[in-house]
Regions:
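TPR/TPR-like alpha-solenoid signature
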Residues: 28, 64, 85, 100, ...
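Repeat-mediated protein-protein interaction surfaces in helical alpha-solenoids
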Residues: 7-18, 129-134
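Hydrophobic face of amphipathic alpha-helices that form TPR/SEL1-like repeat modules
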Residues: 29-36, 63-72, 101-108, 148-155, ...
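Short helix-capping/linker turns of helical repeat alpha-solenoids
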Residues: 20-23, 36-38, 43, 56-59, ...
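Alpha-helical tetratricopeptide repeat
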Residues: 9-12, 16, 24-32, 52, ...
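Terminal, low-structured helical/coil segments at or just beyond the last alpha-helical repeat
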Residues: 172-195
Length: 195
């Protein structure tokens, strides 16, 4: 066995040991490792098990990830009400990706009654948030939430239609390198609003 492989085994053993001892950080780490196949085979059920243990101890990433797993049905049955609960717990801690998912749930009526105004509020909070610890989250507010706000302005859902406001939010997301924002700029002809 090479040193790198031995090192990987030692790291995994320590993560498992600390997770089994109840450390919420290592439980979340182990769950993420199983989810992504990082040093272990992908196993969504094991990922769900460890992430749920960590979320029960209010680890912010785990609460978000558990919400996502209920949202997507990975490692468990799809359950939008439970997804909403866990996204809400993480959103209360000002976690932008969870705030964005709450916006999507209100916009689409998944797990809650459809409410464009409430969706707008959550997208706005997420778009301006600086707490984005997730691997998938942006560093200057959630670019996904910024694009969702732009779509609300383009479609006039919960807000008056406004190309200018849509352009403002797409510009912020585009500045973070969002591919979705780049597609929106072309599709909705928002080039005049891009810095």
């Amino acid at each position: 066995m090479s040193y790198k492989n031995q090192s990987d085994c030692n790291h995994l053993s320590k993560v498992i040991e600390k997770a089994e001892a109840g450390d919420k950080i290592f439980q979340s780490t182990l769950g993420t490792m199983y989810y992504q196949g990082d040093g272990v085979s992908i196993d969504y059920e094991k990922a769900f098990y460890w992430i749920k243990k960590s979320a029960a101890q209010e680890h912010i990433n785990a609460m978000y990830n558990l919400g996502y797993m209920y949202w997507s049905g990975e490692g468990t049955s799809e359950d939008y009400e439970k997804a909403f609960y866990w996204f809400s717990k993480a959103a209360e801690q000002r976690f932008a990706p969870a705030q964005n998912y709450l916006g999507m749930m209100y916009r689409d009526g998944r797990g809650v009654d459809q409410d464009f105004e409430e969706a707008f509020v959550w997208f706005l909070i997420a778009a301006n948030s600086t707490l984005s610890c997730s691997i998938l989250a942006g560093k200057k507010g959630s670019s996904e939430a910024q694009c969702n706000l732009a779509l609300m302005y383009i479609e006039g859902n919960g807000v008056p239609e406004s190309q200018e406001e849509a352009g403002h939010w797409v510009n912020l997301a585009y500045g973070q390198g969002s591919e979705f924002a780049a597609e929106m700029i072309d599709e909705y002809e928002l080039w005049d609003y891009i810095d």
